[in-house]
Amino acid sequence: MSQLPPAIFLMGPTAAGKTDLAIELTKVLPCELISVDSALVYRGMDIGTAKPSKELLAEFPHRLIDILDPAEAYSAADFRRDALEAMAEITARGKIPLLVGGTMLYYKALIEGLADMPAADPEVRAQIEEEAARLGWQALHDQLAAIDPESAARIHPNDPQRLSRALEVYRVSGQSMTELRLKQSVQSTEAAASGLQQLPYTVANLAIAPTNRQVLHERIKQRFTNMLEQGFIDEVVALRNRSDLHAGLPSIRAVGYRQVWDFLDGKLTSAEMQERGIIATRQLAKRQFTWLRSWKDLHWLDSLDCDNLPRALKYLGTISILS
């Protein structure tokens, strides 16, 4: 039997009810919560991220919520570092880390580790930005396609941050992101074969979602409508009023925020903004489902069931995560 300390992953698509179940679990288990969400890290972005209320967070604290200003970037590597530190602190107090959220790349980074990418090089980054100003980002995307077609296929020409980083990695290291990630994948496979652990925990993997996809779509539509009624547009106006924030930042590119930003720019009508915001959220949920379908040892719960807490506890007891 493994002597590794326990941890619980509670995953699922957006609007599935992850937070509610996580709160119920913390009421009956010695758990402490860690958020796994690339948008919830930002302060001042509350309505559009469906961030738990201040009252709820005061009663049930979540690590890694409201830790950054929207002007700052936060990578999967940053998350892995912060999450491992939080998990170690929680475990040291005899508690169980309960990680809850839907940013699947973060879970993957935590489980498998990350490719050893070169550190940012301000000089190279400045050179890339100068080229972009002179030639346009499409020309730089063409450069990336020539050296790393796999990354170019994933990165849109209008995503300057990721495009710049992919070119920077190649210019600094002489290897493409795809090559470095392939090397990391091989190392992870070899580590698993030799019994080495990327993550020093015995992890129970839970996922919650409605079995009826149409129900999820209706939830997404209703939640986006509720956000607008709660003042989502005013929240984005406050962000736009800051001179250091712009549409190219990761925070502003978050689902919902980019559509409201475009509306305020006059690029979309109110109806178009609502429609595109809902569609973008559905597309996010679809991507989350794609990740989850490939996840190993995953125990599914139906959002519509009224007995998910006992079902989750039964599963955790079955795999001896609580012993």
From Swiss-Prot:
Native organism: Pseudomonas fluorescens (strain Pf0-1)
One BP annotation, GO: tRNA modification
Region (Interaction with substrate tRNA): 37-40, 161-165
Subunit-structure text: Monomer.
Family membership noted in the UniProt record: Belongs to the IPP transferase family.
Lineage of the species this protein comes from: Bacteria, Pseudomonadati, Pseudomonadota, Gammaproteobacteria, Pseudomonadales
EC annotation from Swiss-Prot or TrEMBL: 2.5.1.75
UniProt: substrate binding residues: T14, A15, A16, G17, K18, T19
Protein name: tRNA dimethylallyltransferase
UniProt cross-references to Gene3D superfamilies, sorted A to Z: 1.10.20.140, Crystal structure of tRNA isopentenylpyrophosphate transferase (bh2366) domain (1.10.287.890), P-loop containing nucleotide triphosphate hydrolases (3.40.50.300)
